[in-house]
Amino acid sequence: MRQKLRGIIPNLATSIGTSAEANAPGALALGGSSEASKKFSIAEGYLASSDGYGAIAIGSAAKIKQLEKGTINHIVGNDNKGLYVDADGNVTKITVRTESEKDILSRYGQTYGAVALGFRSSSHNLFASSFGAFSTATAIESLAVGDSSQSTGYRSATFGSHSRALAEESLALGYETRANAYGSVALGAESVANEENTVSVGSDTLKRKIVNVADGTEDL
């Protein structure tokens, strides 16, 4: 077990475990080969890695990191501009929706406030959160909950094992659901939503009925 304390009390960096590394003020690495490399970041678990300001990675091989260098990612916004990460791992082009997002990115970096919880879970963007084994959240303010779930659209959310929210502000609820279009909602196991701003309760091959719906309050 190894513990490293650096600087004055408010800026302690602490690492506990074989080859654990805490390399920034306020960082905490707990577990064998864990690494917390940004201010106030936390990495807990074997091979856990947290590379975002104030980011939290908990679980064996859980990971918070910027997207790989040299990759182009078309997941931020529906204008397909996406972001580009240069050879040094720096974001050189990114589509953001608010001035506050732009300010946070410039001040603290791409993975500020990200959270990954679960075996090999990973989050790769501003306020992205993933919960569950192999879950992944890659877009700004995206949320993935459930094993092998994936949220790649700006402000998208997915809940359920193997569910996918792939478009901006899309929502997938249920096992193996797919929300593939802007503002779409896929509701119920294996439902697929392929059209913008629509709610799907099934797919081309899976049909469902919506029952027990009350009358509306106004006549048209």
Where do the language-model regions lie?
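Small/polar residue-rich beta-strand/coil "junction" motifs that cap repeat-based extracellular fibers
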Residues: 1-19, 23-134, 138-220
